[in-house]
Amino acid sequence: MKKLKASEIRQKYLDFFVEKGHMVEPSAPLVPIDDDTLLWINSGVATLKKYFDGRETPKKPRIVNSQKAIRTNDIENVGFTARHHTFFEMLGNFSIGDYFKQEAIEFAWEFLTSDKWMGMEPDKLYVTIHPEDMEAYNIWHKDIGLEESRIIRIEGNFWDIGEGPSGPNTEIFYDRGEAYGQDDPAEEMYPGGENERYLEVWNLVFSEFNHNKDHSYTPLPNKNIDTGMGLERMASVSQNVRTNYETDLFMPIMNEIEKVSGKQYLVNNEQDVAFKVIADHIRTIAFAISDGALPANEGRGYVLRRLLRRAVRFSQTLGINEPFMYKLVDIVADIMEPYYPNVKEKADFIKRVIKSEEERFHETLEDGLAILNELIKKAKATTNEINGKDAFKLYDTYGFPIELTEEIAVQAGLKVDMTTFESEMQQQRDRARQARQNSQSMQVQSEVLKNITSASTFVGYDTATAQTTLTHLIYNGEEVSQVEAGETVYFMLTETPFYAVSGGQVADTGIVYNDNFEIAVSEVTKAPNGQNLHKGVVQFGQVNVGATVSAEVNQNDRRDIQKNHSATHLLHAALKSVLGDHVNQAGSLVEADRLRFDFSHFGPMTNDEIDQVERLVNEEIWKGIDVNIQEMDIASAKEMGAMALFGEKYGDVVRVVNMAPFSIELCGGIHVRNTSEIGLFKIVSESGTGAGVRRIEALTGKAAFLYLEDIQEKFNTMKSQLKVKSDDQVVDKLTQLQDEEKALLKQLEQRDKEITSLKMGNIENQVEEINGYKVLVTEVDVPNAKAIRSTMDDFKSKLQDTIIILASNVDDKVSMVATVPKSLTNNVKAGDLIKQMAPIVGGKGGGRPDMAQGGGTQPENISKSLSFIKDYIKNL
């Protein structure tokens, strides 16, 4: 087997499957996007759910990825085992309704055993399968040539998480040899057992059944492949080391810990635990912060804080009693940089966050350990259990993690009264929930906000930055003097460049900072007394009231918002010009990436009207009109023709945004200085949102250009596929193809009729007399449901005085049609005939007395239904 670096294994895996026609799906951020069901991305397939559940169609049905992931369900095991991790990489190849077991197994075997790829010795590989999966067994045994003795049947080889896709799986194991254990079934020394000799290196899941609500299983219409190979584990096998922690993914970190601690790795088992905890946790923390997570007291932020504090606690067993974890970030960045440059790019920020957390926790730890040692003495002298209220006080007052209290208690031979602790925690949650309800996300006029009357001046019309003072901090519905890192806080500034959400325009985002702390601003709203109320998360440090700070708006977003807001005014004026003065704004949303405008109008706009509006807006952009903004009294504004928005309330002094002569409108938002800054305007959709209200969504500037570029790319592809040279030929070619298709379909229908007629022979000979009626009841072989109706038309023209009932099986679905001559409909009704027949084939139907149709899902009962209907007519 080749000895490969982890980065080489990753690249070989991706290259191999690209050669097999797979599309590389880039590793997604650890913080899930648009998936509230996950705290973290926890597997290779987690980011592909949109493809497997059909929400999106991938560009290719074959996908390969190397996905970073976090799992924290067994944190306490990390450090004590050879392969437990909170952060890991999962290599995976996936098929969305394309290849299945045969190719999946063949691909796996080739990648593992080929000298071009991993070069593993075939005689060291074993596999497990589900006992009933004979298809997988035959592929492994007959096609791959694996001896029967190396194929182990295990009942647990079935991937099933409840309702939804499920199926058997096959796992591939590598035999590391007798140095890791002698064969002994009693000790689970076999592939699939708990041992260190036979390591699972790859899991192939064959998703072929749907687990139904009634716990039955039915075959999936599209079978999928989902595989997973842990990079850390494969690296340990390739590099022939005992544990994942001895691979090149971890050893540079271990070497740095050795330098800082003066201790050696792989000398003392107890020390090794600390080495492994630190090395694992710093990878998780660095990557999570680089992907947008921050230490906090709840959610994923609490996971980070817990991991960091656990690592700091174990670092003390190595004699490290000062912040040092942040120094490992550069090591992690260097190891992972080839595939994950994000950590190196954000290394300075990551280090600042970690160092700030470490400093806080060292203070907490010193105070907390002194108190905990007293509690341990007390418990040993009495019940051998640390009181739950004491543990909660340690957690609540001193920030000492309960997990750490438990861990230290166990080391001292004690337990913690967790029942009482949880009771105290629940009471705290109830208090916090009540506080949240009272404050309603600070958007209601709480007593705290109503009592704040100090001024906060908005200066953002003229600047995106300001040197200012932080005057008020609100945390958990109460005004406070300081707030710690990781917490969500509301605050006010004496002067602020941040625009508060208003008039459909979203709030600015950005940062407020000084040398001691930084707040990432995510929302800005108006407080009851008119001040701009900022919401943000403390990135690092301790925030104090009275601090002098720099306030910086995200200028890229600000510029895009300005473009979209000014374009919204032009759009409003253009709609009035094209559609009429009845158009009034019914709502709007101005964001950085798009604009949305709701307006009153009677019905859908025509394509020509949309084109006219778009052209008008762009012409005003290309004219380069100066945008003049003035404050004046409402009377003067109306006199100059300023448009006031329907339903809006205005004060005595108003702000007029003037793009004369095309648009003059009252507005408090932020705008470009000249319409040419907008660059380009493109309407991307027009739709209805309710009675008399239409909605336009549009893009400006670069976003509009990229949208048009994408359309042009698709058009060029279509032109290439149509094999035409000029743009003008595309429509003519499409028209030609449509005409040809119609002609071919007509020919095909005629051919189908002729084939059906030949198969049926002389239909007059098949007519029976039943109960005095001429009746033709038969199954016909037709290519589609439409063909059964044309066959019926053909038969009717030949058998005008006959009751005709036809049934067909097309793609395991039953179609049936019945006709009754109008002269007979007083006695026999076609609708009744179909209603009687359809349930027999698991369906329903009906229609007029002279013509009816139906369908069903049980083609095996067609003959039964035809016999039944003959008896039914006989008994009329």
Swiss-Prot record:
It is an enzyme of class 6 (ligase). Its main location: cytoplasm. Coiled coil: none annotated. PROSITE patterns: AA_TRNA_LIGASE_II_ALA. It comes from the Bacteria. Pfam families: DHHA1, tRNA-synt_2c, tRNA_SAD. It is found in: Cytoplasm. One of its GO terms (cellular component) is cytosol. Consists of three domains; the N-terminal catalytic domain, the editing domain and the C-terminal C-Ala domain. The editing domain removes incorrectly charged amino acids, while the C-Ala domain, along with tRNA(Ala), serves as a bridge to cooperatively bring together the editing and aminoacylation centers thus stimulating deacylation of misacylated tRNAs. Belongs to the class-II aminoacyl-tRNA synthetase family. Catalyzes the attachment of alanine to tRNA(Ala) in a two-step reaction: alanine is first activated by ATP to form Ala-AMP and then transferred to the acceptor end of tRNA(Ala). Also edits incorrectly charged Ser-tRNA(Ala) and Gly-tRNA(Ala) via its editing domain. This is Alanine--tRNA ligase.
